[in-house]
């Protein structure tokens, strides 16, 4: 059980890192944010967060600037769409995409499921209710964490987790997805730099898998996450 848990935790961390280090995906997030709220980060909290995520992954400034400018051009038109599916062992998969060609994207997503035994695409709405939408902010700080927690409650904080990695202790703040902007502003007001920030979908009834089962499921998840149009993948695996 211990080894399986460690594998699942490492797999989830690997997926987050792999997703966030792909510059094209980061660029799309910046372009979409600029398209929605304007290209001035000072007036657009979503854009500020997208830029912060990109900088945390060492994305060059020229790439960031180009992604913002793309929002005002014809090639800056993207659709944000979701897909739902299931796989072996009771695994549920929720996929968020940003694409300039939905026909291409759904064809690719379907092919990943069709080529995987015991996996299939579901009708949208089939499993969305089994995930709670949350704002998530990862950060490191030397400040008193209890005092910081109390301060962040005023900005919509619901839960604060502390975890340990090779680089030391880091924290993840969770809030309702509607409070993403408020929490982002809270971190700015408190001068706490954010390492990563995103809207996440947390499973309400997570399931446990063995290490062997997890390795099997990872094959499908890797295919999905390698798709350039895929921004995030969520499962009900704990």
Swiss-Prot record:
InterPro entries: Integrase-like_N (IPR017856), TACO1_YebC-like_2nd/3rd_dom (IPR048300), TACO1_YebC_N (IPR049083), Transcrip_reg_TACO1-like (IPR002876), Transcrip_reg_TACO1-like_dom3 (IPR026564), YebC-like (IPR029072). Its main location: cytoplasm. Pfam families: TACO1_YebC_N, Transcrip_reg. SUPFAM superfamilies: YebC-like. Keywords: Cytoplasm, DNA-binding, Transcription, Transcription regulation. It comes from the Bacteria. It is found in: Cytoplasm. GO terms for molecular function: DNA binding. The keyword Cytoplasm applies. GO terms for cellular component: cytosol. One of its GO terms (biological process) is regulation of DNA-templated transcription. Belongs to the TACO1 family. This is Probable transcriptional regulatory protein HH_1604. It comes from Helicobacter hepaticus (strain ATCC 51449 / 3B1).
């Amino acid at each position: 059980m211990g080894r399986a848990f460690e594998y699942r935790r490492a797999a989830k961390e690997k997926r987050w890192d792999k997703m966030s280090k792909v510059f094209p995906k980061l660029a799309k997030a910046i372009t979409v944010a600029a398209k929605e709220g304007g290209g001035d980060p000072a007036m657009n909290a979503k854009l500020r967060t997208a830029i912060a995520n990109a900088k945390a992954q060492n994305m060059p400034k020229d790439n960031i600037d180009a992604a913002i400018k793309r929002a005002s051009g014809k090639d800056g038109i993207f659709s944000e769409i979701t897909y739902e599916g299931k796989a072996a062992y009771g695994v549920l998969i929720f996929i968020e995409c940003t694409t300039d060609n939905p026909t291409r994207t759904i064809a690719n997503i379907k092919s990943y499921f069709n080529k995987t035994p015991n996996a299939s695409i579901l009708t949208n709405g089939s499993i969305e209710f089994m995930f709670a939408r949350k704002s998530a902010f990862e950060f490191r700080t030397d400040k008193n964490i209890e005092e910081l927690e109390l301060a962040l409650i005023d900005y919509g904080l619901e839960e604060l987790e502390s975890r340990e990695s090779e680089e030391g202790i880091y924290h993840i703040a969770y809030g309702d997805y509607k409070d993403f902007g408020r929490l982002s502003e809270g971190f700015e007001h408190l001068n706490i730099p954010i390492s990563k920030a995103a809207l996440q979908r947390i499973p309400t009834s997570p399931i446990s898998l063995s290490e062997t089962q997890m390795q099997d499921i990872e094959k499908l998840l890797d295919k999905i996450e390698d798709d350039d149009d895929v921004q995030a993948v969520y499962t009900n695996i704990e």
